[in-house]
Amino acid sequence: KKTYGQRFIHIGNDGDVGQIRGLPLNQIYRNAKIAVGDTLNLDFSYPYYYSDRLFEQPGRGAFQIFPNIKGVEDQYEDGKEIVLYEHGNLDDLKEKIDYYLTHDEEREAIRHAGFLRTKRDHTYVTRWQTILNTVFENEV
């Protein structure tokens, strides 16, 4: 808030506008220039544990900057489908926000690629297919 003022809005029960769901949330994500991944807890360091917003934000059309938590790079390609910042390094996050606020075409290309990757690989259908394949492949 100090750095970006009214251009920064925190959505959620503990945020500026409370909880938003459904179509209004789609519109917010799609119209925002940048959505920041929500793992800002600096004490958080669990590999392969990240929020569903990793998939929700690009799936709803957002350009996303997300903390580089181990395993995220297996889901999206950094710099091509989303942008990763060093977890806990708020200077790195600010630098990337400032860069992408002034590079519209690059930001839009990454946003679109992230949306397509999500629709291709990160839907509930693909998750259920993976679960069922794993269960049936490992049947005793």
PLM regions and their residue ranges:
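Nucleotide-sugar donor-binding catalytic core of glycosyltransferases
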Residues: K1-D78, N138
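Generic anion/oxyanion-binding catalytic loop in active/binding sites
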Residues: V17, Y46, I82, H103, ...
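Short, hydrophobic/aromatic alpha-helical segments in well-folded domains
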Residues: P24, R53, K96, A113-G114
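Short basic/hydrophobic patches in alpha-helices and adjacent helix-turn junctions
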Residues: E56, D98-T102, L116, R120
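Short, contiguous hydrophobic alpha-helices characteristic of membrane insertion segments
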Residues: Q64-P67, E81-G88, I131-V140
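Two-component system phosphotransfer/interaction surface
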Residues: L90-T102, W128-F136
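A charged, aromatic-enriched C-terminal amphipathic alpha-helix characteristic of glycosyltransferases
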Residues: E105-N133
